[in-house]
Amino acid sequence: MTSEVSTNTPPPSPISGARIARNAGAMMAAQLLTWAMAFVVAIFQPRILGPLAIGQLSIAFSIWMIVGVLITFGMDTYLTKAVAREPQRTGVLVGTSLVVRIGLWLLGCLAVFGYDLFAVNADPTQTALIWIIGLMTLFSVLSGGLIATLNGLEQVHYVSLVTVLSKMVLTVVSLALLFAGFNVIWIGWANVLAALVAFLGDAFFLFRQHRPRWSIDLAAAGLMLNVSKQYLVTALTLMVYQQIDRLFIALFASTEAVGWYGTAVNLFGTLMFFPMAIGTVIFPTLTRRFAAGQEHLAMAAQPIFNIMLALSIPIGLGLVAIAEPVALLLYGEAFRPTGVVLAVLGIVLICTYLNTVLSQLLIAADRTAALNIIMIAATVATLPLDAILIPWTNRVFANGALGGALAYTITELGILIAAIKVLPKGTLGAQNWRVGVLTGLAGAGMLLAIWWLRESTFFFLAVPLGAAVYIGLVLAFRALPDDDLTIIKEALSKLIARLPFIGRKLKPAQPEA
C-alpha cells in the first residue's frame, strides 16, 4: 500500500494573487467562448435534424448523464481536495481514480443494457445512439478526473484551454456534418471525438508533470470511494432532477416530444451564462465579508439578490413574450410546440437565477445539509409531477413536453421558497422584498409594452423596446438602491476588462515616465 509520511509533505505555497487573477480570467474567457459555441449548435442542430432525431439524442444523453454521475461517484471533489493537500501523491491518486472509473463504467454498461432492453422502444437508431454516447461518457468521466486533478494543482488555465478546444471541435465537426447532410448517428460520433480530444488534452497537460501509476492500490481505491460517497448523493440528486423529465416524456408521450423539450431546455441553458458570469465577478468579492462573522451575511446577500432579481425578471418575462415566434424562426414549423415550452421556461428562468444565488449563500452560511434536503425533496416531487402532468398535457394539448416544463416550474418555485426560508434569519430583509415588488412591476410594464409585437413580423424589436421600457421603469421607480447600482457598474467594468481583446483595448494607456 502506498502511503506518505506527513512530515515529508512540503508546506503549502503562499496564495498568489496573480494566479487567482489568471485562473479567474481564463475561466471567464472559457465560459464566454463555450457559451457562444453551444448557442450556435443549439440553433442549427434541431432545425436540420428535426424533433425525432433530437429526441433520440436527448434520451441517450439523459441516460448516460445519470449513469455518468454514478461512475464518477463523487471522486472529482475528493481528487481536487486530496491533490491540493498532497500534490506529491498525484500520480497514485490519478491512476487509482482512472482505473476505478473504467471498472464502474463497465458496470454502468450492464445497467444501461438492461434499461435499453426493457424501457426503450426497439429502435435501432436509438439503441445505436445510446451506445455511442456511452463511449463518449467513458472519455468524459476519465477527463473529469484529470480536470479535478488539474484544479487541485491550481492549473485551471489548462482546463479552460482544453475545454474551449474540445467545444470548438464539437461545434465545427457537428456543423460540418449537419450541413453535409449526415444524420444524428454521425452527430453522436462528433460528441465522441470532442470527448476524446478533451481527454487527450487534459492528459497531455497533467501527465507531463505527474505520470499516473496504473497499478491499482485496493486500499487507496476503497478509501477514495468511501470518502467520495458523501459527494455522490448531491451530484446524483442534481443530475436526476435535471434529466428525469426527458425520460418521463419519452415514457408517457413520444420521442418527438422529448425533442421539443430538449430543444427548449438547451436554448434556455444558454441563458444561464449570465448568472454564472455575474457570480464569477461579484460573488467572490461579496463572500469575503463572511469571514468577519455571521452578522455580515446580510451585507453580502442582499445586494446580489437584488441584482439577480433585476436581471432575471426582464430576461424571463421577455422570453415569455417572444418564445413562440423565436422558436418558429429558429427551428421551423416542426418545432412549433417548443414555443410554448420555452415560454413556460421563461418563468423557470427567474426562479433558477435566484436559486443560483441562494445555493451559493446557503453553502457560504454552512447550510449545505439543508440545501441537499431541498434538492432531494425537489427530485422526489418531480417524479409524481411528471407522471401526472406529462400524460395530461399530451392528452389535452398533444404536447407532453409542456408537462415537463410545468413540473420544472413547480419544483424550481418550491426550491426558491424553501431556500429563502432556511437562510439564516435576517439574511434577506424588507429592502429585498421592496426591490422584488418594484422590479416585478417594471417587468409587468415591459411585458405589456412588448406583448403586441409577438404576432408581428418585427417581433425582434421587442428586445430593444423591452430593455428601454424596463430600464426606464426601474429608474423611475427607484427600484434599486444606489449602492446596488454602483456594484452593477463596477461588475460590468470588471467583466469587460476580463474579456480577451476587448478589455485590453479599453485599458487606459499608462503615461510615459
Regions found by a protein language model. Name each.
Residues 82-100, 260-376:
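Specific pore-lining/lateral-gate transmembrane helices of multi-pass inner-membrane transport
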